[in-house]
């Protein structure tokens, strides 16, 4: 067994850094000298810059895990366990999982075995054989989802590639625990688009129109949700990072190591006024529909010019309250509170002050969002393919939010 295994990290196909796994389980990250010296280098992560914008070049080793930026590229929870079980390894072995999945990760980053180092840390046949199928699960997150190609000339539908690499669509399968989740998300994302938010192209598809599903996904009912990937274009991959990566925290802390005020602060410093307004729209909308799962990984930055961040298009907008009785807390604190009902003009003013955002921009955007929601929701809720329980729950919940009542006056 080799004492050291090295993975090359590439950004837009160009080498930028290495991850070195030592025999004692430590992983060491280091930038390449050429990347450090390149004044026009593409941005890998805001978390790898100091408060003055300079590149950080010294990092501590991580024991038994990879650094947070890379840990957040890997699947979580049951999906990670499924992959690890198939490969015969422990779910905690992140370096090995990154070796398996690194050719098709979110954004424009890829991870490859260093030249002459094609074997994984433990050169086991089961791991080598599991790698091609594992790539089909290379999207980060908990929900069962795959990257897929759309069949424009073959009667429609989508195909999950046999070895997982490529694909400009995401297919999210029905939940085995909660009914109608794809339909719920389709409806909420559609409402958001009608309200003027930046939402990618999406559609509901019958399960029999999705080819290439791997074995072991279980018995599924309902439709799947297909979403066009905003990190893939005809010109190639576009780099993205979620806010767990931005803040340098591991996925396990996506609910407790940040808040919406902190996200707003980053957007105010790094992006545009339009992006700050879009952030407030999504935050208010998510509160009105009862989305209690907008944690750090459900907000992302995108790098259209490879260097400058912008708020990415919206994703994972759905109403969670129909599935969790009595749920009335957001995934993160707004500024002082997590209670959805307590989101008010005063709470947003506090958020704006602490995040150093324009209070007028924040409050005016919130008012406009509430007004648009009331109009669009009332006009469209019966035209969308969500369960009656979802619509009824939102009808009951939205008026409990203080902002909703304040702007109704």
Swiss-Prot record:
It comes from the Bacteria. The active site is at residue 293. This is Putative kinase Y4dM. Disulfide bonds: none annotated. Transmembrane segments: none annotated. The keyword Transferase applies. GO terms for cellular component: cytosol. One of its GO terms (molecular function) is protein serine/threonine kinase activity. It comes from Sinorhizobium fredii (strain NBRC 101917 / NGR234).
